[in-house]
C-alpha cells in the first residue's frame, strides 16, 4: 500500500506524565531494524514461552543484549543465556542501540543505558494482556518500545489494573517511551487484527528496550 505520509517528519504526542509517543521516529531506520531482527532470530529463534501458570503466550519472542527476558513454569526472570540454545543471547545490534538512544534522548531520558531488548512477533490474533514491567532492579530507568509492521492498538492504563485505559493505535515506525511517574503503569496490546505491511507481511514486530542489570 502506498504510504502517503512517508516524508512526514516525526512528531510527539504526550501520553501521561513521563510517557510519550514518538510518531514515525523509527520509520527511516525500519529496514535496518528488520534486517537485524532477522539476524538475531537466526541465532536465537522466536519461540512462544510458557507462563508460570502454564499458559502458552500467543506472542512469539526472542531477545538480544547482555540479558534476555524469559519465562517458564518457575517464574519470570532475566538470563544471560538463551535457554533454547544454551548460548549467550546475540549482542544488541548497532541499529537497535542507535534508535533506542535517540528515542530516549527525545523523550527526556538521556542517561538511559539499555542492556536488554525483548523482540516480540505478533501474528493475527496475538495479544499481550495488561501487565506491569517490574522485573527490573532499577525502576528509575524507562522503557523504550518500537513498533514495526502491521498496526496494533496499545493499551496504557495506570498504577492499578482497574484504572481507565487509553487505547492508542501504533503504526510502523512509532515509538512509545515511558518512565518516571508512569514507569509502572499497566499496558498491553489488543489482539492484532489481520493486515498486511509490505516490509513485514502479516506480522507486527516490537522491540522493547530495558535496563535489566544492577547499575554499579
UniProtKB/Swiss-Prot annotation:
Annotated catalysed reactions: a methylated nucleobase within DNA + 2-oxoglutarate + O2 = a nucleobase within DNA + formaldehyde + succinate + CO2
GO biological process terms held by the UniProt record: DNA alkylation repair; oxidative RNA demethylation; RNA repair
Residue ranges of the TM segments: none
Cofactor remark from the record: Binds 1 Fe(2+) ion per subunit.
Residue ranges annotated for the Fe2OG dioxygenase domain, each copy included: 113-213
Annotated 2-oxoglutarate binding sites: 120-122, 204-210
Name of this protein: Alpha-ketoglutarate-dependent dioxygenase AlkB
Protein species of origin: Salmonella typhimurium (strain LT2 / SGSC1412 / ATCC 700720)
Gene name linked to the record: alkB
Amino acid at each position: 500500500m502506498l504510504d502517503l505520509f512517508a516524508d512526514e517528519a516525526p512528531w510527539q504526542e504526550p501520553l501521561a506524565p513521563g510517557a510519550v509517543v514518538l510518531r514515525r521516529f523509527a520509520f527511516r531506520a525500519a529496514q535496518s531494524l528488520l534486517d537485524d531482527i532477522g539476524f538475531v532470530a537466526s541465532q536465537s529463534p522466536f519461540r512462544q514461552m510458557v507462563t508460570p501458570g502454564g499458559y502458552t503466550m500467543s506472542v512469539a519472542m526472542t531477545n538480544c543484549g547482555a540479558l534476555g527476558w524469559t519465562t517458564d513454569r518457575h517464574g519470570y526472570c532475566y538470563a544471560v543465556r538463551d535457554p533454547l540454545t544454551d548460548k549467550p543471547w546475540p549482542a544488541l545490534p548497532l541499529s537497535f542501540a542507535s534508535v533506542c538512544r535517540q528515542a530516549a534522548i527525545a523523550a527526556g531520558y538521556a542517561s538511559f543505558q539499555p542492556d536488554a531488548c525483548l523482540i516480540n512477533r505478533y501474528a493475527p490474533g496475538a495479544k499481550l494482556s495488561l501487565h506491569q514491567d517490574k522485573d527490573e532492579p532499577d525502576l528509575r530507568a524507562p522503557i523504550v518500545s518500537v513498533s514495526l509492521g502491521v498496526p496494533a492498538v496499545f493499551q496504557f492504563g495506570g498504577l492499578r489494573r482497574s484504572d481507565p485505559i487509553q487505547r492508542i493505535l501504533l503504526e510502523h515506525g512509532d515509538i512509545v517511551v515511558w518512565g518516571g511517574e508512569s514507569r509502572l503503569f499497566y499496558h498491553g496490546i489488543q489482539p492484532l487484527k489481520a493486515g498486511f505491511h509490505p516490509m513485514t507481511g502479516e506480522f507486527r514486530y516490537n522491540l522493547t528496550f530495558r535496563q535489566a542489570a544492577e547499575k554499579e
